[in-house]
Amino acid sequence: VVESRGEIFTIPADKGDVRNLTASSGAAEREPAWSPDGKFVSYFSDVSGEYRLVVEAQDGLTPPREIALDKPTRYYTPAWSPDSTKLLYTDTNLNVWVMDVVSGTAKIVGRDPWMVPSRTLAPSWSPDSRWVAFATRLDTMYRAIVVANADTGQRRQITDGLADAMYPVWD
C-alpha cells in the first residue's frame, strides 16, 4: 500500500492491477498502513474537513469505516498491533494513542512534554500486542524509553535517562 498525491493505492507484489482505494479529488489521504493479518488498510483522511482514521477492507468489497479522532490536529505514524486489533499513532501535540479498531475507542498512553526540534516518539508494538514502547524527553532534555500497557495505559520508564535513548525496537 502506498500514498501518492493524496491518494491511497494498493499495488500487487507480483501480478494484478493497481487499485486506488480512495479516489477522492480535493481531499488528502495519507500515511497508509496494512494490518499484519493482511485484511485491512488504515489511513488518515481529511475528506470530511477534519482528519479521521479510515479502516478499509483491502479487497475493497465493503465500504470504508471512518472513525472520528479525539481532537482536531494532525496525526502521524499509524501502526497496527501484531494481532491486528489495535492501531498506534501519534499527533502534533506529541501524544501517543492506542485505538481499539473494533470499538473505535482511543486513549492516550503517553506523551512527550517538550515541543522541541527533532521531536520523535518512535512508538513500536511488542510482539504480543500488549505493550507499546516510545521515547519521551525528560526534564534533563535527554530522551528515555517508556513502555505502556496498551489496554490500561500504565507506563514505566525502562532506561535511566542519563543519555539519549531513542527508537525502541522489540526482540
Can you annotate each of these PLM segments?
Residues T22, V54, A68-L69, G110-R111, ...:
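Residue-level detector of conserved, well-ordered beta-strand and adjacent loop positions
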